[in-house]
Amino acid sequence: MSMSDPIADMLTRIRNAQMVEKAVVLVPSSKVKVAIAQVLKDEGYIDGFSVKANDGKPQLEIALKYYAGRPVIERIERVSRPGLRVYKGHGAIPQVMNGLGVAIVTTPQGVMTDRKARATGTGGEVLCYVA
């Protein structure tokens, strides 16, 4: 059976792995998931990631990051979902925790943070909030 929301599955796997203090988590790979992982790495929420072929099916291996024994990601939640897409113009993209967190947005220029989307004047679909 196919997954109805693969991005929510990825975020849930990250959240669950951090609750049990795993070093890495494996997620089925896709271009959007790799782009989300790149944004998380650029913002310092994860240590790194790599795509590995596992029996012909690519797997995204995400190295989780901890500080003083606590997960760096305190909150990660899906915003736009298959049943209710959330699109925002560049002026309406929300700030997460007054700028302490990030909203990950997919735009015509690719997947980026809310700050970069506002700076480039581009709106798009708000995928998730990370803090």
From Swiss-Prot:
Domain of life: Bacteria
Pfam families: Ribosomal_S8 (PF00410)
Coiled-coil spans in chain: none
Keyword field contains Ribonucleoprotein: yes
Plastid as UniProt keyword: no
One GO biological process term: translation
Example of a GO cellular component annotation carried by this entry: ribosome
Keyword terms: Ribonucleoprotein, Ribosomal protein, RNA-binding, rRNA-binding
InterPro entries: Ribosomal_uS8, Ribosomal_uS8_CS, Ribosomal_uS8_sf
Record-linked Gene3D superfamilies: 3.30.1370.30, 3.30.1490.10
Transmembrane segments: none
GO molecular function, one term: rRNA binding
Subunit structure: Part of the 30S ribosomal subunit. Contacts proteins S5 and S12.
Function comment: One of the primary rRNA binding proteins, it binds directly to 16S rRNA central domain where it helps coordinate assembly of the platform of the 30S subunit.
UniProt similarity note: Belongs to the universal ribosomal protein uS8 family.
Protein name: Small ribosomal subunit protein uS8
Species, as recorded: Polaromonas naphthalenivorans (strain CJ2)
